[in-house]
Amino acid sequence: MDYLLGLMGGLGLFLYGMSLMGDGLQKAAGNKLKNIIGALTKNTFMGILVGTVVTMIIQSSSATTVMVVGFVNAGLMNLYQAVGIIFGANIGTTITGQMLALNISRYAPIAIFIGVLLFMLGKKKRIKSYAEIVLGLGILFFGMAAMGDAMRPLGESAVYANLMAKLTNPWLGLLVGIVMTTILQSSSAAQAIILALASQNIINMLSLIHI
C-alpha cells in the first residue's frame, strides 16, 4: 500500500511540474509562439519540426493538438499544415520520454531551489515565468525520483514479477499503454511511470517497448 501512495504522490508532482513548466514557457513566449507557428508551417517538413519543438516546450502533445485545432477553426492554418504539426507532436512526445530516461533526478533539488529563489526575488513577470520553468522542471524530475523509489519494493514481489512477465505479449503491452495514457491524459506521464519501473528493474526492456 505504501508503494501505491508513493506512486500517486510522485505522479502528482510529475504532472504538476510538467504543467508548471508548460505554463511558464507559454507565458515567456507569449503571442510570439502563435506567430512563429503560423509563419513556419508553410510546408509539411517545417510543420513536423514545429510540432516536435512545440510539444517538447509545452510538454503535451494533447495541448499542441488542441492549439492546432484552434488555429484551423480560426482560419489561421489549413488542414494540410495541421497534419504536419500533429505528426510532429507525436515525435516530440518520444523525445520527452528520452529526456525523462536521463538520470538527472539528483539535480532536481537544485532546480527547485533556483526556481523558488527566482520566483521570490524576481519583480518582472518574465523573470517569474522563467522561475516557473526551472521550478517546474525540478518538481517534474523530483516526482520521477519519488516514483522510482516507491516502486523499488515491487522488485521483490513474486506476484508482480509474474504479472510483468505477461507484458512480453505485445498486444497486452499495447493495451496497457493505451489504457494508462487514456486515464492519465498524458503520454509523458505514462512514460514516466514505465521508466520509473524500468529504473528499478521491475519491468524489462521488451515489455517497456510494447507499452
Question: Where do the protein language model's features map onto the residues?
Answer:
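Hydrophobic, membrane-inserted alpha-helices
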Residues: G47-G51, A89-G97, I112-L118, V176-G177, ...
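C-terminal ends of transmembrane helices
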Residues: M18-K27, V68-N73, I114-K128
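Helix-loop-helix hairpins and the membrane-proximal interhelical loops
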Residues: M1-T44, V134-V179, L197-N201
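Short juxtamembrane and helix-loop transition motifs at transmembrane-helix boundaries
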Residues: N43-G47, T64-L76, I91-A101, T168-L175, ...
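Hydrophobic alpha-helical transmembrane segments of multi-pass integral membrane proteins
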Residues: L40-M67, P170-I193
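Re-entrant/interfacial helical elements at transmembrane boundaries that shape
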Residues: A63-N73, I112-V116, A189-S199
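Membrane-embedded alpha-helical segments of transport systems
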Residues: T55-T64, M77, V83-M99, I104-P109, ...
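Conserved small/polar residues in nucleotide/adenosyl-binding loops
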Residues: I209-I211
